[in-house]
């Protein structure tokens, strides 16, 4: 399980400015010299870029970063409206939190951190942002190269999603910030139900995740940001088709089968439509593989670095 203290994680990061907003970025590790690479490793790969999910943050990946950064450079950042990144209150979803804008942010972070050829890792809402980057890569429009795409539980195939009560309640609210914070308990209990029985979240983990949501009055924005679900529906041909037809780099799926939201039918459908997809199912894992089984995620990434 991820046991990295939130303060240590924040202290280890830095901020860049993008679109007049402050973006929290955590970069660690370094690219090894070519003579130090294991046999079969691609010397052109210069790092790992991780895109987190909703309502998570870069902290979700702290334990993975600690291990993978022993082998290469790892960059993970807080998306607009998440964690320690700016959370603008003026304007609605399309202006501030569109998945296309989040993908632009990912490109800006990669450029700022000097990434040119990466293993792209994505989860949950980040899965769809990753799909947009994969689309751009397939069409020669991405500013960096994808060496391998590792995709984890997410509901880009939104027609198959099983929304929980918290998500349904947030989607029923207007597309504007709330006047007051939502109760912490709403998030703690909503998150608790998305972990597996074998890797149940501790109170400490749930409180850290909720702290990241509540930072900068972020809970007030949840009804706005969650409209990414509706944007997925408006782009039902665009992003799922990318996952079905991605051709410009290898593509692996790692899926926790106890996920009550991003259900097994989703990874099965991607595998059915794209048989060459490297699919790994974990029966004992829920929605948060990077928190529940970081050692497995780390191994998957390191294996892709080494061959």
Regions found by a protein language model. Name each.
Residues 157-216, 220-224, 229-234:
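Helix-rich cap/lid subdomain of alpha/beta-hydrolase
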Residues 55-63, 74:
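Serine-hydrolase catalytic-loop signature spanning alpha/beta hydrolases and amidase-signature enzymes
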Residues 218-272, 281:
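Conserved serine/cysteine hydrolase catalytic core
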Residues 49-53, 255:
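The conserved beta1-alpha1 loop
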Residues 112, 116-160:
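Conserved hydrolase catalytic core segment
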Residues 276-307:
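Catalytic active-site module of serine/aspartate enzymes centered on a nucleophile-bearing elbow/loop
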């Amino acid at each position: 399980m991820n046991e990295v203290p939130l303060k240590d994680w924040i202290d280890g990061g830095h901020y860049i400015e993008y679109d007049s907003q402050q973006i929290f970025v955590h970069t660690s590790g370094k690219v090894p010299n070519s003579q130090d690479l294991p046999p079969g490793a691609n010397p052109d790969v210069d790092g790992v870029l991780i895109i987190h999910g909703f309502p998570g943050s870069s902290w979700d990946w702290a334990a993975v970063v600690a291990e993978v950064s022993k082998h290469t450079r790892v960059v993970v950042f807080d998306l607009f409206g998440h964690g320690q990144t700016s959370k603008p209150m003026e304007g609605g979803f399309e202006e501030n939190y569109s998945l296309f804008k989040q993908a632009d942010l990912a490109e800006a972070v990669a450029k700022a951190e000097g990434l040119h050829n990466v293993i792209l890792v994505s989860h949950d809402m980040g899965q769809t942002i990753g799909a947009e980057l994969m689309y751009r890569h397939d069409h020669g429009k991405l500013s960096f190269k994808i060496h391998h795409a590792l995709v984890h539980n997410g509901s880009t195939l939104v027609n198959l999603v099983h929304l929980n009560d918290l998500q349904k309640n947030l989607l029923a609210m207007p597309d504007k910030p709330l006047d007051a914070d939502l109760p912490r308990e709403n998030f703690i209990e909503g998150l608790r139900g998305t972990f597996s029985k074998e890797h149940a979240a501790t109170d400490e983990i749930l409180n850290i995740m909720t702290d990241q949501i509540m930072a900068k009055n972020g809970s007030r924005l949840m009804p706005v940001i969650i409209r990414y679900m509706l944007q997925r529906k408006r782009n039902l041909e665009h992003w799922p088709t990318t996952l079905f037809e991605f051709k410009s780099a290898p593509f692996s799926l790692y899926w926790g089968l106890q996920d009550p939201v991003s259900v097994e039918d989703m990874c099965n459908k991607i595998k059915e439509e794209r048989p060459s997809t490297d699919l790994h199912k974990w029966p004992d894992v829920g929605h948060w593989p990077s928190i529940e089984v970081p050692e497995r995620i780390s191994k998957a990434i390191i294996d892709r670095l080494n061959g």
